[in-house]
Amino acid sequence: MDPDAGVIFARTAAGAAVALGLLKCGRIWLCPVCSGQDPARPSEEITEAVVSWLQQGGWAYLVTFTARHTAADRLSDLMDALQGTRADAETGTKRRPGAYQRLITGAAWAGDKRRKSNQEGIRGRIGYIGMIRATEVTVGEGAGWHPHIHAIVLVGGRTEGQRGDKRITGTFTPSEDALTEWEDRWRRSGPATLARSTPGFRPPTGARSPGATAGARATASTSSSSVRSGRQRPGRVHRQDAGRQEPGPGAGTRRPQGRPPGQHDVLRTPSRIGDLMGGVPEEEAAGHGSLAWGLDRWAEYETAVSGAGHRVDPLPAPAPGPDRRRHRGRRHGRPVPDRRRRRFRDGVQIWDRAWKGLVGRSLDLAVVEAVEGREISMDALGELVQSAGQSRAFLRVLTPQEVTELYDELLRTLARRREQAAERRAAEAAEAEPTTR
């Protein structure tokens, strides 16, 4: 937290409270600040990105990246194999790509300019421009952990330029042959890349057992609410895994098929823990597993996914033209709203001293509840600050412009402090080096 600016709580157009100026831990189920804003953050971005692309004439497919697992596998190992390892400067750990990253690299995918038969690769033949992805984790006493990635893959785009200079020039309908080639490659490559990442991995039996499964196709007629909830237009399922039941006409939401008995979304675990700790008998509480089992699983999950969330991969910008209007809120031309341009209704500034008092009395969540909604409850905030032994004078209502200006100043201050810290660490390292003669 910046001691000069304190903490800023901004209220979005949807009424959600967003904390600015706080170093967040990313533990969305143990931290009231992170839990309050994480669910609301990606929904607007995902909806706008997908609907904008469909309205331009592009195509979107729902794809699931999954991996075989056993009860003996640790969640962190499975997620590293699927998503890759994170870089850690303190431990010297380097970033290592996982099975997901390897699916979108290589000559077969990206093309080979030296070969006339594969100049553009699968990526060019389907018009791939990017994807939006999020990780879901299920767990069971028998089958153990099962992390998998749900992705919305955006295809059907014509582009020009290379890498950072790539621009979207139009849209087209990918051929059935190109889509089949893409699907087959991801099915074949998934198990193989997982095996390379995790020596103990054993590919599933069966020629059609997937490392990636194609799901429903979203169409230009898909509404914003449908995209947000994952529902598709009835009867418009385009491609589906052969090992799963085909939804018939009128199918709405697509439930995961083939989940083993006793396997549930790990996010249901806290509810069962609360019931069991409150005295509800095991057979009556929702979910499964003993209290000790649930606590152990939740601790492992919370550690393994700290800071994880939805990812929007970089998308090419539209090509400039006299009749092309930039979509409001785009960042570098991407059909994703810039968070710094988010339309804030208003906000409130809480000075350093008052915020420390609120945190000391565990009133973080109460502050979020007072900010979010149709309007900021300054009376409730004032009472909270006074209950923490501080003055109401440490609160200030902010206009949308003031929120943006303060946030920009916070970012500049953070960048400046990071530079100073890097210089300080470099100087300390130089002093610690032994003198050589």
Swiss-Prot record:
Residues 203-229 have a biased composition (Low complexity). GO terms for biological process: response to antibiotic. Residues 161-285, 305-338 are annotated as: Disordered. The keyword ATP-binding does not apply. Residues 324-338 have a biased composition (Basic residues). Keywords: Antibiotic resistance, Plasmid. It comes from the Bacteria. Belongs to the Gram-positive plasmids replication protein type 1 family. This is Neomycin resistance protein. It comes from Streptomyces cyanogenus.
